[in-house]
């Protein structure tokens, strides 16, 4: 009897081993979590705006609920009102998991204790308003400030190609800020990217979000 049970156990283990031979079928260790991308809409006058997200991954949370898109009336100060429910929001929120390979060829090495000052300065340089970069910092700072160092990057096409936004009516200016970072035990040498300041004009859409890469 014991011999039969042992054989059965070994058979199960062997089957599991074979089944996990294909990375796509077992586990999601290579997935990254795109955290708290929030979308601000700033039209010149009160405007009904439809927003769709074509995401190369799985949405795990949205607010308000994403139902084949968002449809809101946006005010010049960024206040949003859901067309269907009439409820008011400050921005559109989503999170998801994908297998995006983020680019760490250029970035910044920052001591954990200096993270708040760095983010405030750099996000303002990129083009976020104080309200926007304050919300960014209070979300990410608790995850970053106790690390010895952080390797911080701001992604461009790698991110925007994996999370394509379609906004109707078409905005006049769009800023999408997505930070990917890694914790470091010690500093490394890396080239800093060139920052092109963002110019807000007409109907403006702003998004920020981020992810930690192990």
Residue ranges and their predicted role:
Residues 6-12:
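Sec-dependent N-terminal signal peptides
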Residues 16-19:
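C-terminal motif of bacterial Sec signal peptides marking the signal peptidase cleavage site
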């Amino acid at each position: 009897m014991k011999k039969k049970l042992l054989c059965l156990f070994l058979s199960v283990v062997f089957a599991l081993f074979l089944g996990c031979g294909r990375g796509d079928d077992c586990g999601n260790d290579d997935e990254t979590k795109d955290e708290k991308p929030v979308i601000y809409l700033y039209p010149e006058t009160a405007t009904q705006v439809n927003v769709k997200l074509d995401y190369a991954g799985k949405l795990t949370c949205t607010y308000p609920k994403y139902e084949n898109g968002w449809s809101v009336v946006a005010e010049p100060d960024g206040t949003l009102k859901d067309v269907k429910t009439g409820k008011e929001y400050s921005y559109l929120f989503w999170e998801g998991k994908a297998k995006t390979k983020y680019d760490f060829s250029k970035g910044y090495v920052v001591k954990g204790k200096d993270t708040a000052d760095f983010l405030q300065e750099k996000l303002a340089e990129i083009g976020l308003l104080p309200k926007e970069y304050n919300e960014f910092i209070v979300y990410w700072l608790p995850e970053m400030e106790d690390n010895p160092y952080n390797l911080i990057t701001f992604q461009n096409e790698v991110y925007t190609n994996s999370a394509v936004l379609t906004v109707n009516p078409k905005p006049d200016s769009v800023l999408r800020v997505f930070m990917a970072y890694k914790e470091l035990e010690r500093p490394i040498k890396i080239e800093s990217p060139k920052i092109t300041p963002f110019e807000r004009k007409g109907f403006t859409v702003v998004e920020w979000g981020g992810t930690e890469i192990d």
